[in-house]
Amino acid sequence: MTSIWLHESDFRYVNLDVERYQKKYRLTLTNGNKYVFIKDKEDISDVNPFIPYILMEEGMNNVLVKSDDYKDILIYQGVNIQCLDFLNDNDISVEKLVDFETVELKADELNKIKARRLDAQLIEDEVKNNKVFIIGFIAIVIISIGVFWLM
């Protein structure tokens, strides 16, 4: 697996205006330099990929979230930065690169946050299913009335 940092001016072949690159790979350091992180294969086996986005929905920003059951999650400038393994492997202190607050969460606290999001999603799905049922029921009633009227 190859992981590299490139200065933004060296990053020629990818359109950085594309939202997916802005969200995952762009990082502005405290000294004002802009860098882009490229990883040829993402390994998300140890992190539920939805957790960082759930935390962002909870209003977390410019935080390093440490947990006992998950890899560290850095949410910086409203972006989930997915390069902490690379930084750690190369003895680069993320604390020296960007300014953020460190938050310690137990795995069960993260799971509660996840569960709240899952409950909200289940309620949304149930509402959608109810709307589909009601529309289907109304359609059947209209068709039945139409059939009896034609007879």
UniProtKB/Swiss-Prot annotation:
Subcellular location: Cell membrane
Main subcellular localisation: membrane
Domain of life: Bacteria
Transmembrane regions: 132-151
Keywords per UniProt: Cell membrane, Membrane, Transmembrane, Transmembrane helix
GO cellular component: plasma membrane
Record's bilayer topology term: Single-pass membrane protein
Signal peptide per UniProt: none
Biological role stated in the UniProt entry: Involved in TCP pilus biogenesis.
Protein name per its UniProtKB record: Toxin coregulated pilus biosynthesis protein R
Species per Swiss-Prot/TrEMBL record: Vibrio cholerae serotype O1 (strain ATCC 39315 / El Tor Inaba N16961)
